[in-house]
Design a protein with these regions (language model features):
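Signature of N6-adenine DNA methyltransferases within the class I
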Residues: 3-18, 22, 35-66, 76, ...
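Proline-centric
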Residues: 19-25, 109, 140-144, 207, ...
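Phosphate-coordination loops involved in phosphoryl transfer and adenosine-cofactor binding
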Residues: 28
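Alpha-helical interaction/dimerization surfaces of two-component signaling modules
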Residues: 48, 67-71, 417
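Periplasmic c-type cytochrome electron-transfer domains
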Residues: 232, 236, 420-423, 498-499
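Non-catalytic DNA-recognition/assembly elements of restriction-modification systems
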Residues: 259-287, 304-309, 327, 450-508
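Polybasic, glycine- and aromatic-enriched phosphate-binding surface used to engage nucleic acids
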Residues: 263-264, 269-456
Length: 508
Protein backbone atom coordinates (compact mmCIF):
# COMPACT_ATOMS: atom_id res chain seq x y z
CA UNK A 1 0.00 0.00 0.00
CA UNK A 2 1.01 3.65 -0.39
CA UNK A 3 3.05 5.00 2.49
CA UNK A 4 0.36 7.56 3.26
CA UNK A 5 -2.03 4.73 4.23
CA UNK A 6 0.44 2.10 5.45
CA UNK A 7 -2.31 -0.52 5.60
CA UNK A 8 -1.60 -4.19 6.23
CA UNK A 9 -4.77 -6.13 5.54
CA UNK A 10 -5.73 -8.92 7.92
CA UNK A 11 -5.54 -11.90 5.56
CA UNK A 12 -4.97 -14.56 8.21
CA UNK A 13 -8.14 -16.56 8.92
CA UNK A 14 -6.74 -17.61 12.29
CA UNK A 15 -6.10 -14.01 13.37
CA UNK A 16 -9.56 -12.90 12.25
CA UNK A 17 -11.22 -15.83 14.04
CA UNK A 18 -9.28 -15.17 17.22
CA UNK A 19 -10.17 -11.47 17.22
CA UNK A 20 -13.87 -12.13 16.58
CA UNK A 21 -13.96 -14.67 19.40
CA UNK A 22 -12.38 -12.17 21.80
CA UNK A 23 -14.77 -9.41 20.72
CA UNK A 24 -17.76 -11.62 21.70
CA UNK A 25 -20.38 -9.51 19.92
CA UNK A 26 -24.10 -9.82 20.64
CA UNK A 27 -27.19 -8.93 18.60
CA UNK A 28 -28.53 -5.37 18.42
CA UNK A 29 -25.03 -4.01 19.00
CA UNK A 30 -23.44 -0.95 17.40
CA UNK A 31 -19.95 -1.78 16.15
CA UNK A 32 -17.19 0.48 14.82
CA UNK A 33 -14.53 -0.54 12.32
CA UNK A 34 -12.38 2.64 12.20
CA UNK A 35 -10.14 1.62 9.27
CA UNK A 36 -12.08 -0.93 7.24
CA UNK A 37 -9.68 -1.57 4.37
CA UNK A 38 -11.19 -4.23 2.13
CA UNK A 39 -13.85 -5.21 4.70
CA UNK A 40 -12.36 -8.39 6.16
CA UNK A 41 -13.66 -7.63 9.67
CA UNK A 42 -17.03 -6.43 8.37
CA UNK A 43 -17.47 -9.74 6.53
CA UNK A 44 -16.54 -11.71 9.65
CA UNK A 45 -18.87 -9.66 11.86
CA UNK A 46 -21.83 -10.24 9.53
CA UNK A 47 -21.13 -13.97 9.44
CA UNK A 48 -21.03 -14.05 13.24
CA UNK A 49 -24.20 -12.01 13.85
CA UNK A 50 -26.49 -10.50 11.22
CA UNK A 51 -28.63 -8.41 13.57
CA UNK A 52 -26.05 -5.70 14.28
CA UNK A 53 -25.24 -2.21 13.09
CA UNK A 54 -21.76 -1.62 11.67
CA UNK A 55 -20.17 1.77 11.02
CA UNK A 56 -17.06 1.32 8.88
CA UNK A 57 -14.64 4.19 8.21
CA UNK A 58 -12.12 4.17 5.38
CA UNK A 59 -9.82 7.06 4.37
CA UNK A 60 -8.77 5.66 0.99
CA UNK A 61 -11.50 6.81 -1.42
CA UNK A 62 -10.99 3.87 -3.80
CA UNK A 63 -11.35 1.35 -0.98
CA UNK A 64 -14.34 3.26 0.42
CA UNK A 65 -16.10 3.14 -2.96
CA UNK A 66 -15.41 -0.58 -3.22
CA UNK A 67 -16.90 -1.09 0.24
CA UNK A 68 -20.02 0.89 -0.66
CA UNK A 69 -20.56 -1.36 -3.69
CA UNK A 70 -19.81 -4.49 -1.67
CA UNK A 71 -22.37 -3.70 1.06
CA UNK A 72 -24.95 -1.93 -1.09
CA UNK A 73 -27.61 -4.46 -0.09
CA UNK A 74 -26.74 -4.32 3.61
CA UNK A 75 -28.71 -1.45 5.23
CA UNK A 76 -27.11 -2.22 8.60
CA UNK A 77 -23.63 -1.42 7.23
CA UNK A 78 -22.73 2.23 6.69
CA UNK A 79 -19.48 3.19 4.95
CA UNK A 80 -17.94 6.57 5.77
CA UNK A 81 -15.13 7.95 3.61
CA UNK A 82 -13.51 10.11 6.31
CA UNK A 83 -10.29 10.35 8.30
CA UNK A 84 -11.28 8.67 11.55
CA UNK A 85 -8.72 10.62 13.57
CA UNK A 86 -10.13 13.96 12.38
CA UNK A 87 -13.83 13.09 12.15
CA UNK A 88 -15.66 15.94 13.85
CA UNK A 89 -18.20 13.80 15.73
CA UNK A 90 -15.39 11.69 17.16
CA UNK A 91 -13.24 14.54 18.41
CA UNK A 92 -16.25 16.29 19.94
CA UNK A 93 -18.41 15.03 22.78
CA UNK A 94 -20.88 13.61 20.25
CA UNK A 95 -18.64 10.63 19.65
CA UNK A 96 -17.88 9.68 23.25
CA UNK A 97 -19.46 6.50 24.69
CA UNK A 98 -21.01 5.66 21.32
CA UNK A 99 -20.10 2.05 20.47
CA UNK A 100 -20.67 -1.35 22.08
CA UNK A 101 -17.76 -2.96 20.24
CA UNK A 102 -14.74 -1.78 18.25
CA UNK A 103 -12.43 -3.98 16.19
CA UNK A 104 -9.53 -2.84 14.03
CA UNK A 105 -6.22 -3.44 12.37
CA UNK A 106 -5.16 0.24 12.20
CA UNK A 107 -2.41 1.53 9.90
CA UNK A 108 1.12 1.31 11.32
CA UNK A 109 3.49 4.22 10.81
CA UNK A 110 1.42 5.93 8.12
CA UNK A 111 3.01 9.13 6.84
CA UNK A 112 1.39 12.33 8.09
CA UNK A 113 2.18 15.57 6.26
CA UNK A 114 3.36 18.37 8.54
CA UNK A 115 0.09 20.32 8.39
CA UNK A 116 -1.84 17.26 9.53
CA UNK A 117 0.70 16.58 12.27
CA UNK A 118 0.11 20.06 13.66
CA UNK A 119 -3.65 19.46 13.66
CA UNK A 120 -3.26 16.08 15.36
CA UNK A 121 -0.96 17.59 17.99
CA UNK A 122 -3.68 20.07 18.88
CA UNK A 123 -6.36 17.37 19.10
CA UNK A 124 -4.21 14.74 20.84
CA UNK A 125 -1.58 16.84 22.68
CA UNK A 126 -0.23 14.05 24.88
CA UNK A 127 0.22 11.41 22.20
CA UNK A 128 3.13 10.56 19.93
CA UNK A 129 1.18 11.41 16.80
CA UNK A 130 3.86 10.24 14.36
CA UNK A 131 2.69 6.69 15.16
CA UNK A 132 -0.83 6.40 13.79
CA UNK A 133 -1.94 3.15 15.39
CA UNK A 134 -1.57 4.47 18.95
CA UNK A 135 -3.72 7.50 18.11
CA UNK A 136 -6.42 5.15 16.78
CA UNK A 137 -6.23 3.12 19.99
CA UNK A 138 -6.57 6.17 22.23
CA UNK A 139 -9.47 7.63 20.24
CA UNK A 140 -11.38 4.35 20.03
CA UNK A 141 -11.23 3.75 23.77
CA UNK A 142 -12.93 7.12 24.24
CA UNK A 143 -15.62 6.08 21.72
CA UNK A 144 -16.56 2.93 23.64
CA UNK A 145 -19.60 2.81 25.87
CA UNK A 146 -19.07 1.89 29.50
CA UNK A 147 -18.58 -1.88 29.46
CA UNK A 148 -17.85 -1.81 25.72
CA UNK A 149 -15.22 -4.16 24.30
CA UNK A 150 -12.32 -3.39 21.97
CA UNK A 151 -10.00 -5.75 20.11
CA UNK A 152 -7.04 -4.25 18.21
CA UNK A 153 -4.10 -5.79 16.41
CA UNK A 154 -1.04 -3.51 16.37
CA UNK A 155 2.74 -3.59 16.77
CA UNK A 156 3.69 -4.23 20.39
CA UNK A 157 5.91 -1.13 20.68
CA UNK A 158 3.31 0.88 22.63
CA UNK A 159 3.73 -1.53 25.54
CA UNK A 160 7.26 -0.35 26.31
CA UNK A 161 8.56 2.63 24.34
CA UNK A 162 8.99 5.86 26.29
CA UNK A 163 7.03 8.02 23.84
CA UNK A 164 3.86 6.04 24.63
CA UNK A 165 3.92 6.62 28.41
CA UNK A 166 0.75 8.74 28.40
CA UNK A 167 -1.15 6.19 26.32
CA UNK A 168 -0.22 3.33 28.68
CA UNK A 169 -1.40 5.28 31.72
CA UNK A 170 -4.66 6.15 29.94
CA UNK A 171 -5.31 2.50 29.05
CA UNK A 172 -4.42 1.20 32.51
CA UNK A 173 -6.67 3.69 34.30
CA UNK A 174 -9.65 3.68 31.92
CA UNK A 175 -9.96 0.04 30.90
CA UNK A 176 -9.70 -3.49 32.21
CA UNK A 177 -7.33 -5.35 29.92
CA UNK A 178 -8.45 -8.93 29.56
CA UNK A 179 -5.74 -10.33 27.33
CA UNK A 180 -2.72 -9.43 25.23
CA UNK A 181 -1.43 -11.99 22.74
CA UNK A 182 2.02 -11.32 21.31
CA UNK A 183 3.40 -13.05 18.21
CA UNK A 184 5.72 -12.61 15.25
CA UNK A 185 4.66 -10.13 12.57
CA UNK A 186 5.33 -12.86 10.01
CA UNK A 187 1.94 -14.32 11.01
CA UNK A 188 0.59 -11.68 8.61
CA UNK A 189 1.15 -12.99 5.06
CA UNK A 190 3.76 -10.82 3.36
CA UNK A 191 4.60 -8.81 6.51
CA UNK A 192 7.68 -9.07 8.72
CA UNK A 193 8.72 -6.15 10.91
CA UNK A 194 12.28 -6.37 12.11
CA UNK A 195 11.71 -3.85 14.89
CA UNK A 196 8.76 -5.37 16.74
CA UNK A 197 6.21 -8.12 17.13
CA UNK A 198 2.45 -7.82 16.80
CA UNK A 199 0.04 -7.73 19.71
CA UNK A 200 -3.72 -8.30 19.91
CA UNK A 201 -5.20 -6.48 22.89
CA UNK A 202 -8.67 -7.19 24.28
CA UNK A 203 -10.01 -4.66 26.77
CA UNK A 204 -13.24 -3.44 28.37
CA UNK A 205 -14.06 0.24 29.02
CA UNK A 206 -14.36 0.80 32.76
CA UNK A 207 -14.57 4.09 34.66
CA UNK A 208 -13.71 2.44 37.99
CA UNK A 209 -9.96 3.02 38.31
CA UNK A 210 -9.62 0.86 41.44
CA UNK A 211 -11.19 -2.12 39.68
CA UNK A 212 -8.98 -1.54 36.66
CA UNK A 213 -5.77 -1.45 38.69
CA UNK A 214 -6.75 -4.63 40.55
CA UNK A 215 -7.43 -6.39 37.26
CA UNK A 216 -5.07 -9.18 36.20
CA UNK A 217 -3.99 -9.17 32.56
CA UNK A 218 -3.44 -12.45 30.78
CA UNK A 219 -0.37 -12.10 28.55
CA UNK A 220 0.16 -14.90 26.04
CA UNK A 221 3.32 -15.39 23.99
CA UNK A 222 5.41 -18.16 22.46
CA UNK A 223 3.08 -18.88 19.53
CA UNK A 224 4.78 -20.91 16.81
CA UNK A 225 2.21 -20.41 14.03
CA UNK A 226 -1.09 -18.57 13.49
CA UNK A 227 -3.17 -21.66 14.30
CA UNK A 228 -1.77 -21.56 17.86
CA UNK A 229 -3.84 -18.43 18.49
CA UNK A 230 -6.94 -20.62 18.60
CA UNK A 231 -5.41 -22.92 21.21
CA UNK A 232 -2.96 -21.76 23.87
CA UNK A 233 -1.89 -25.29 24.83
CA UNK A 234 1.74 -24.72 23.82
CA UNK A 235 1.90 -20.98 24.52
CA UNK A 236 3.45 -19.19 27.49
CA UNK A 237 0.93 -17.48 29.77
CA UNK A 238 1.80 -14.76 32.28
CA UNK A 239 -0.58 -12.92 34.61
CA UNK A 240 0.23 -9.43 35.84
CA UNK A 241 -1.87 -6.84 37.69
CA UNK A 242 -2.46 -3.48 36.04
CA UNK A 243 -1.43 -1.86 39.33
CA UNK A 244 1.99 -3.51 39.05
CA UNK A 245 2.42 -2.13 35.54
CA UNK A 246 1.36 1.41 36.40
CA UNK A 247 3.96 1.45 39.19
CA UNK A 248 6.73 0.57 36.74
CA UNK A 249 8.88 3.40 35.43
CA UNK A 250 7.00 5.06 32.54
CA UNK A 251 4.17 2.53 33.22
CA UNK A 252 5.99 0.10 30.94
CA UNK A 253 4.75 -3.46 30.44
CA UNK A 254 7.86 -5.01 31.94
CA UNK A 255 7.21 -8.68 32.39
CA UNK A 256 8.75 -12.09 31.94
CA UNK A 257 7.36 -15.59 31.99
CA UNK A 258 9.92 -16.13 34.76
CA UNK A 259 8.35 -14.93 38.05
CA UNK A 260 11.76 -14.32 39.65
CA UNK A 261 12.92 -12.17 36.75
CA UNK A 262 9.65 -10.24 36.98
CA UNK A 263 10.51 -9.32 40.58
CA UNK A 264 14.10 -8.51 39.67
CA UNK A 265 12.97 -6.25 36.82
CA UNK A 266 10.50 -4.40 39.02
CA UNK A 267 12.65 -4.15 42.17
CA UNK A 268 16.31 -4.16 41.09
CA UNK A 269 18.91 -3.22 43.68
CA UNK A 270 21.29 -2.02 40.95
CA UNK A 271 20.74 -1.14 37.30
CA UNK A 272 23.34 -0.69 34.58
CA UNK A 273 22.63 3.05 34.69
CA UNK A 274 23.69 3.12 38.35
CA UNK A 275 27.22 1.93 37.58
CA UNK A 276 27.83 3.08 34.01
CA UNK A 277 27.15 5.97 31.64
CA UNK A 278 25.16 4.86 28.59
CA UNK A 279 25.43 7.23 25.64
CA UNK A 280 25.16 7.34 21.86
CA UNK A 281 27.92 8.52 19.59
CA UNK A 282 28.70 10.96 16.81
CA UNK A 283 26.90 11.65 13.54
CA UNK A 284 28.92 13.52 10.94
CA UNK A 285 25.93 14.92 9.06
CA UNK A 286 27.33 13.42 5.83
CA UNK A 287 28.92 10.01 6.43
CA UNK A 288 29.88 9.36 2.83
CA UNK A 289 31.88 12.56 2.81
CA UNK A 290 33.65 12.11 6.14
CA UNK A 291 33.87 8.34 6.68
CA UNK A 292 35.98 5.83 4.79
CA UNK A 293 36.14 2.03 4.93
CA UNK A 294 38.92 -0.54 5.10
CA UNK A 295 37.70 -2.31 1.96
CA UNK A 296 34.45 -3.10 0.21
CA UNK A 297 34.12 -6.54 1.79
CA UNK A 298 32.74 -4.70 4.83
CA UNK A 299 28.95 -4.84 5.00
CA UNK A 300 27.10 -1.76 3.65
CA UNK A 301 30.35 -0.19 2.41
CA UNK A 302 29.63 -0.09 -1.33
CA UNK A 303 29.28 3.70 -1.59
CA UNK A 304 32.19 4.61 0.69
CA UNK A 305 35.78 5.43 -0.30
CA UNK A 306 38.54 3.03 0.75
CA UNK A 307 41.04 4.42 3.25
CA UNK A 308 44.69 4.64 2.26
CA UNK A 309 47.57 3.93 4.66
CA UNK A 310 48.92 7.48 4.58
CA UNK A 311 45.56 8.83 5.79
CA UNK A 312 45.55 6.77 9.00
CA UNK A 313 46.27 8.39 12.34
CA UNK A 314 49.03 6.26 13.88
CA UNK A 315 50.84 6.72 17.20
CA UNK A 316 49.27 10.14 17.73
CA UNK A 317 47.66 11.24 20.98
CA UNK A 318 43.90 11.64 20.38
CA UNK A 319 42.81 15.27 20.22
CA UNK A 320 39.14 16.20 20.61
CA UNK A 321 39.70 19.32 18.52
CA UNK A 322 41.19 17.41 15.59
CA UNK A 323 44.54 17.50 13.79
CA UNK A 324 46.16 20.18 11.63
CA UNK A 325 46.20 17.87 8.62
CA UNK A 326 43.68 15.36 7.28
CA UNK A 327 43.94 12.19 9.36
CA UNK A 328 41.40 9.45 9.92
CA UNK A 329 40.75 7.72 13.26
CA UNK A 330 38.83 4.46 13.80
CA UNK A 331 35.10 4.69 14.42
CA UNK A 332 32.80 1.84 15.47
CA UNK A 333 29.59 1.54 13.49
CA UNK A 334 26.70 -0.91 13.87
CA UNK A 335 26.99 -4.65 13.42
CA UNK A 336 26.76 -7.42 15.98
CA UNK A 337 30.25 -8.50 17.01
CA UNK A 338 31.15 -10.05 20.35
CA UNK A 339 34.08 -9.10 22.61
CA UNK A 340 36.54 -7.61 20.09
CA UNK A 341 35.84 -5.69 16.90
CA UNK A 342 38.45 -4.91 14.26
CA UNK A 343 38.91 -1.50 12.68
CA UNK A 344 36.71 -1.36 9.57
CA UNK A 345 35.57 2.25 9.49
CA UNK A 346 37.47 5.52 9.81
CA UNK A 347 36.32 9.09 10.37
CA UNK A 348 38.04 12.26 9.17
CA UNK A 349 39.46 13.95 12.29
CA UNK A 350 41.04 17.08 10.85
CA UNK A 351 40.33 20.32 12.71
CA UNK A 352 38.22 21.50 9.79
CA UNK A 353 36.10 18.35 9.86
CA UNK A 354 35.68 18.41 13.63
CA UNK A 355 34.54 22.01 13.41
CA UNK A 356 31.95 20.91 10.85
CA UNK A 357 30.67 18.18 13.18
CA UNK A 358 30.32 20.75 15.96
CA UNK A 359 28.48 23.40 13.96
CA UNK A 360 26.54 21.73 11.13
CA UNK A 361 22.84 21.53 11.94
CA UNK A 362 22.59 17.90 10.78
CA UNK A 363 25.67 16.73 12.68
CA UNK A 364 25.69 15.43 16.24
CA UNK A 365 28.93 16.05 18.14
CA UNK A 366 27.32 14.47 21.19
CA UNK A 367 28.76 12.98 24.38
CA UNK A 368 32.24 14.01 23.26
CA UNK A 369 33.62 13.52 26.80
CA UNK A 370 33.51 9.79 26.03
CA UNK A 371 35.39 9.95 22.70
CA UNK A 372 38.63 7.93 22.72
CA UNK A 373 37.70 6.28 26.04
CA UNK A 374 37.49 2.62 27.04
CA UNK A 375 34.05 1.11 27.32
CA UNK A 376 31.63 -1.27 25.63
CA UNK A 377 30.05 -0.87 22.19
CA UNK A 378 26.48 -2.21 22.09
CA UNK A 379 24.74 -1.99 18.67
CA UNK A 380 21.50 -0.05 18.95
CA UNK A 381 19.73 -2.55 16.70
CA UNK A 382 20.17 -6.28 17.17
CA UNK A 383 18.36 -9.33 15.92
CA UNK A 384 18.35 -12.44 18.08
CA UNK A 385 20.63 -11.45 20.92
CA UNK A 386 22.44 -8.49 22.46
CA UNK A 387 26.16 -8.26 21.78
CA UNK A 388 28.96 -6.05 23.03
CA UNK A 389 32.58 -5.46 22.11
CA UNK A 390 35.36 -3.33 23.58
CA UNK A 391 35.54 0.22 22.28
CA UNK A 392 39.32 0.29 22.86
CA UNK A 393 39.61 4.09 22.89
CA UNK A 394 37.90 4.59 19.56
CA UNK A 395 34.94 6.77 18.62
CA UNK A 396 31.44 5.32 18.36
CA UNK A 397 28.82 6.53 15.90
CA UNK A 398 25.12 7.10 16.56
CA UNK A 399 24.22 3.48 15.77
CA UNK A 400 26.11 2.37 18.90
CA UNK A 401 25.33 2.73 22.58
CA UNK A 402 28.53 3.22 24.50
CA UNK A 403 28.51 1.73 28.02
CA UNK A 404 31.24 3.34 30.12
CA UNK A 405 31.57 1.80 33.61
CA UNK A 406 32.41 4.37 36.26
CA UNK A 407 34.63 1.77 37.90
CA UNK A 408 37.09 0.43 35.32
CA UNK A 409 37.30 -2.87 37.20
CA UNK A 410 33.84 -3.69 35.84
CA UNK A 411 34.70 -3.35 32.12
CA UNK A 412 35.46 -7.01 31.38
CA UNK A 413 32.78 -8.21 33.82
CA UNK A 414 30.14 -6.15 31.99
CA UNK A 415 31.54 -7.18 28.61
CA UNK A 416 30.89 -10.78 29.60
CA UNK A 417 27.40 -9.95 30.93
CA UNK A 418 26.25 -8.14 27.78
CA UNK A 419 27.10 -11.21 25.70
CA UNK A 420 25.08 -13.65 27.83
CA UNK A 421 21.60 -14.99 27.22
CA UNK A 422 20.29 -13.62 30.53
CA UNK A 423 21.22 -10.06 29.50
CA UNK A 424 19.25 -10.50 26.28
CA UNK A 425 16.31 -11.93 28.23
CA UNK A 426 16.32 -9.00 30.68
CA UNK A 427 16.54 -6.35 27.97
CA UNK A 428 13.85 -8.00 25.85
CA UNK A 429 11.59 -8.03 28.91
CA UNK A 430 12.18 -4.30 29.34
CA UNK A 431 11.82 -3.58 25.63
CA UNK A 432 10.80 -6.44 23.31
CA UNK A 433 11.68 -4.51 20.15
CA UNK A 434 15.06 -4.77 18.43
CA UNK A 435 15.93 -1.23 19.51
CA UNK A 436 18.57 -1.24 22.27
CA UNK A 437 18.60 2.48 23.00
CA UNK A 438 20.63 3.93 25.86
CA UNK A 439 17.56 4.59 28.00
CA UNK A 440 16.56 0.91 27.93
CA UNK A 441 20.08 -0.38 28.53
CA UNK A 442 20.28 1.81 31.65
CA UNK A 443 17.30 -0.08 33.09
CA UNK A 444 18.84 -3.57 32.88
CA UNK A 445 19.20 -5.06 36.40
CA UNK A 446 22.71 -6.14 37.30
CA UNK A 447 24.01 -8.13 40.27
CA UNK A 448 27.63 -7.47 41.23
CA UNK A 449 29.17 -10.66 42.64
CA UNK A 450 32.18 -11.01 44.95
CA UNK A 451 35.69 -10.01 43.92
CA UNK A 452 36.87 -13.54 43.15
CA UNK A 453 33.92 -14.17 40.86
CA UNK A 454 34.73 -11.01 38.91
CA UNK A 455 38.39 -12.09 38.63
CA UNK A 456 37.28 -15.50 37.34
CA UNK A 457 35.01 -13.90 34.73
CA UNK A 458 37.76 -11.49 33.66
CA UNK A 459 40.17 -14.41 33.19
CA UNK A 460 37.70 -16.19 30.91
CA UNK A 461 37.25 -13.01 28.85
CA UNK A 462 41.03 -12.69 28.46
CA UNK A 463 41.12 -16.28 27.16
CA UNK A 464 38.39 -15.40 24.64
CA UNK A 465 40.49 -12.42 23.49
CA UNK A 466 43.46 -14.72 22.87
CA UNK A 467 41.35 -17.24 20.95
CA UNK A 468 39.65 -14.58 18.82
CA UNK A 469 43.03 -13.25 17.69
CA UNK A 470 43.91 -16.67 16.23
CA UNK A 471 40.36 -17.55 15.08
CA UNK A 472 40.09 -20.15 17.83
CA UNK A 473 36.89 -21.76 19.08
CA UNK A 474 35.62 -20.25 22.33
CA UNK A 475 32.04 -21.59 22.41
CA UNK A 476 32.74 -23.71 25.51
CA UNK A 477 33.97 -20.64 27.38
CA UNK A 478 30.87 -18.70 26.37
CA UNK A 479 28.73 -21.52 27.74
CA UNK A 480 30.69 -21.40 30.99
CA UNK A 481 30.13 -17.63 31.23
CA UNK A 482 26.45 -18.13 30.54
CA UNK A 483 26.29 -20.66 33.38
CA UNK A 484 28.17 -18.37 35.75
CA UNK A 485 25.74 -15.50 35.16
CA UNK A 486 22.79 -17.84 35.60
CA UNK A 487 24.25 -18.73 39.00
CA UNK A 488 24.81 -15.05 39.82
CA UNK A 489 21.22 -14.19 38.99
CA UNK A 490 19.42 -17.33 40.19
CA UNK A 491 21.42 -18.66 43.13
CA UNK A 492 19.92 -17.46 46.42
CA UNK A 493 17.26 -15.58 44.46
CA UNK A 494 15.32 -14.76 47.63
CA UNK A 495 18.31 -12.80 48.89
CA UNK A 496 18.70 -10.99 45.58
CA UNK A 497 15.11 -9.78 45.69
CA UNK A 498 14.06 -9.60 49.35
CA UNK A 499 17.26 -8.77 51.18
CA UNK A 500 19.25 -7.21 48.32
CA UNK A 501 22.36 -9.11 49.32
CA UNK A 502 25.26 -9.84 47.00
CA UNK A 503 26.33 -13.46 46.81
CA UNK A 504 29.77 -14.84 47.53
CA UNK A 505 29.54 -17.30 44.66
CA UNK A 506 33.07 -18.24 43.80
CA UNK A 507 34.91 -16.96 46.87
CA UNK A 508 37.91 -18.97 47.97
Amino acid sequence: MEKIYQQYYTKSNEIVSYMLNKLAIRENSVILEPCAGDGVFVDALLQKESNIKIEAFELNINEANNLKKKYYTKPNVSIVNEDTLLYNDFISNKGKNRYDFIIANPPYGAWQDYDKRNILKEIYPNLYIKETYTTFLYLCISLLKEGGRLVFITPDTYLNLHMHTFLRKYILQNTSIEEISIFNSSFFPGVNFGYSKLAIITLVKNRNIINNLNNKIKIISGFKEPADLLSTTNARITYIEQNDIIQNENHAFIYSDDEYLNDLLRFPSIRIGDIADCVTGIYTGDDRRFIKVKDHSVKNSKNYEIISDNELCINTVPDLNGYDKVLYVPIIKGGNTRYLKNDFWYINWSKESVQFYKTNRKSRFQNSQFYFKQGLAVPMVSSNSITASLINNRIIDQSIVGVFPRNEEYILFLLAFFNTSICTKLLRSINPSANNSANYIKKIPIIIPDYNTIVHINTLIEIIFSLKKVDGDYTSIEKELDNIFNVIFYENRDKNISKRLQNELFAI
